[in-house]
Amino acid sequence: MKKKYRFLKIIFVAGIWIFLLRFSLQRFNNRPVEDIVVKMLQKEPVSFINDKIVREIIRRENPTNRIGDLNILSLERAIRAMPMVDSANVYLKLNGQLNLDIIQRIPIFRLSKNDKYFYVDEKGVDFPMSSSYSYPCMLVSGKVDPEEYPMLVELVKIINRDDFSKNFFVGISKKGNDYYLMTNEGNYVVELGRLENLGFKIKGFKTFVEKYLIYQDQMKYSKISGITA
C-alpha cells in the first residue's frame, strides 16, 4: 500500500511540475521581444549596418513581436545574408533577452570595375558599396579577376604597414596583365608587373626613392619600373 501511495504521489507531483512548466513556457512565449542587445564585434569600427537596421530586420522576421513566434535560425540567416556581414550569431537568453553578435566585413581596398564600385575584404570577398557610409581604403581599378583579390589584399597590406608607402601610393591600376601603383608625387606611375614578389618590389622602390629619386626632377618621369628598382 505504501508503495502504491508513493507511486501516486510521484505521479501527482510530476503532473504539477509539468503543468507549471507548460504554464510558464506559455507565458514566456507570449511575452513581447523587448530587450534586444546588438553587438558589433569586428576589430575595426565600421558602420555599414547599425542598430536601427538590425532592429528593422528583427521586426520583419517577427512581425508579431512574440517570443514564441521568433525563429532564431531564420533571423540569423537574414542577418548573414547581408553582403557586408561576415558572420552573425543570434541567441535568446532564459530571461527573454535577444542577443545578436555581428561581425561586419572590413574593406581592404575599393575596386572600380566596369563602371561599378565594390569593396573587397581581407578574405578576398567583394561586396557592394554603401550609399550611407564610406570606408577609406586604397582604390584599385581595371579588369581585375576575382582570383587576383588575395594577392591584391596582400599588396595593400604591405603598403599600409609602411608609413612611406602608405603616404606615397594612392591607388593601384591594372592595364593588360600588369599592375601599376599611382603616386602622389610627380607625373609617374610605378610599374609592378605581375602580382608576385610584392614585398621585394615595394622595398626596392622605396630604396630607389630615398637614395636617388628625391635628388632628381620627378616631373620628368612618366613611369618607373618597380620590377628592377
Predicted regions and their residues:
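Charged, solvent-exposed interaction patches on well-folded alpha/beta domains
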Residues: 1-39, 45-66, 70-81, 86-229
